[in-house]
A protein has these predicted regions:
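Alpha-helical transmembrane segments of multi-pass membrane proteins predominantly involved
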Residues: 1-480
Length: 480
């Protein structure tokens, strides 16, 4: 085997990321705590260099590497650029928060970069083993990140719960993959699809394997009834880690699901679509109703995530138009969640952890700008125009209607109206309740600037949604 046969160029962003990650990891060993900002700067530089590398090797169409186990296409390129941007922003947001809690350490950055590498492999996988390796690299990094605050019993408990349930989901995924291999004789997505299309596969075994794989995907997305870990992780993990867990990995999981279900098992769409419909309906009901009862804003955002994943699963029911709407929704959700968690991190000081809804009381009187940014995020999540969240939900609902799923569309609208209640409750607390304290808000200018850009993208791309929708549609052109 020649190295040239591997065609490494499409995978150059991941290769550069791995190399620079090693540099950050080794350099951090020699950096003392008072100079830890150097690790922070090196990590930011790593993300920038990897993003530039991705743009430098950008090619039109689809290109594979590693003998067809890795693919660089429009969807993977767009997803990776969004992942890089989210990681960069979250590094900026989290710095003052981590410093106040003695977790401003190299482990946070190296584990985040390992997770980013895992996500990059996931979204570029063209083979079940590649997808599994990327997923496990992401999962193992997140387990450690959640337990990063060693003096917190809640963090340790959340990490242990996530680890146990994550190991179970990984086992189910492997079991499903083994059945797919037994049914088709291949683990390559294209070969599995061709085998099923040509009726050369063991249909019963393939469908049974598909059931296990859908369960594993539902766990990674946090869909009901496999959502048990989501509120515990969001609540127990440091807010900086919860922000990471709740944003970038969701985009990777959506693309991961697309790769497996559409490019690998598209011929049995009629079998997995009803399963996704049940998961979506359950997620919308449980997510929205449970969120209404929460007083802890991190747990509220966790159940909100569950309901948003329900919308994304509905998008898989609606064919090519639905896939575009689903990818757009995933990007929108990640941007909205990044703003929400970013504001919570900025409001959290050394003495106060902003984690209850009442902690936001009177925020408009204490810092009107952060109150406005939180308002943009909450309104967008509620689906109020002209913000991105409205067009994300509108796109999914219209895609469902075009496919004749009228009742699912009506149900989604009803759930959106119910969900708007708890988002508007947060806005009411921010603007109309009296503050419980006069604790000054942090004034990290870098975090404030990036957070402002993040929030205004929700408004800008809400006013001009077609820009991002076209990106998503073009990204999927050579993938479908």
């Amino acid at each position: 085997m020649n190295w040239s046969d591997l065609n490494l160029m499409p995978a150059m962003p991941e290769i550069v990321l791995l190399a620079l990650l090693g540099v950050v990891l080794l350099a951090d060993l020699w950096i003392c705590d008072k100079n830890r900002y150097l690790t922070h700067l090196m990590s930011l530089g790593t993300v920038i260099i990897v993003a530039v590398t991705q743009l430098a090797v950008w090619e039109q169409g689809s290109v594979d590497a590693f003998h067809g186990m890795y693919i660089a296409d429009g969807m993977s390129r767009l997803a990776k650029l969004v992942l890089y941007a989210l990681t960069f922003g979250l590094f900026i947001y989290s710095k003052p928060y981590n410093q106040d809690r003695q977790i401003f350490k190299g482990e946070f950055y190296t584990l985040s970069l390992f997770a980013l590498l895992g996500m990059s492999v996931m979204v570029s996988s063209a083979h079940f083993l590649t997808a599994y390796i990327g997923l496990e690299l992401l999962s193992l990094s997140l387990y450690a990140m959640i337990a990063l605050r060693r003096d917190s019993g809640r963090s340790a408990e959340a990490a242990l719960k996530y680890f146990v349930l994550g190991a179970l989901a990984s086992g189910l995924l492997l079991y499903g993959i083994s059945m797919v291999y037994g049914a088709t004789g291949s683990l390559d997505f294209a070969s599995v699809l061709a085998s099923a299309f040509n009726e050369q596969a063991n249909e019963w075994l393939l469908k049974l394997g598909m059931v296990f794989i859908v369960v594993a995907i539902a766990f990674k997305l946090g869909a009901v009834p496999f959502h048990m870990w989501v509120p515990d992780v969001y609540d127990g993990a440091p807010t900086s880690v919860a922000a990471f867990v709740g944003t970038a990995p969701k985009i990777a999981a959506v693309v991961f699901a697309f790769r497996i279900l559409v490019t690998g098992m598209g011929t049995i769409h009629s079998d997995w679509a009803p399963m996704l419909a049940i998961l979506a309906v359950a997620s919308l009901v449980v997510g929205n109703l449970a969120a209404i009862m929460q007083t802890n804003i991190k747990r509220m955002l966790a159940y909100s995530t569950v309901s948003h994943m329900g919308f994304i699963l509905l998008a898989f029911m609606a064919g090519a138009v639905g896939f575009t709407a689903g990818l757009y929704y995933a990007i929108t959700y990640a941007l909205m969640a990044a703003v929400s968690f970013g504001v919570l991190m900025v409001l959290s000081t050394r003495d106060i952890e902003c984690e209850n809804i009442k902690d936001l009381a009177g925020l408009n009187q204490r810092h009107a700008w952060f109150a406005f940014l939180m308002l943009l995020s909450m309104f967008s999540m509620a689906g109020i125009p002209p913000l991105m969240g409205f067009y994300a939900k509108f796109g999914v609902i219209m895609a469902l209607l075009k496919q004749g799923h009228v009742w699912l569309s009506v149900f989604a609208v009803i759930m959106s109206l119910i969900g708007a209640f708890y988002y508007l409750r947060v806005v009411k607390v921010i603007y109309f309740d009296a503050p419980d304290h006069d604790q000054p808000v942090g004034s990290n200018y870098a975090a404030k600037f990036v957070l402002t850009v993040n929030a205004f993208l929700l408004l800008l791309w809400g006013i001009m949604p077609q820009t991002v929708i076209d990106w998503c549609a073009k990204a999927l052109e050579n993938t479908l």
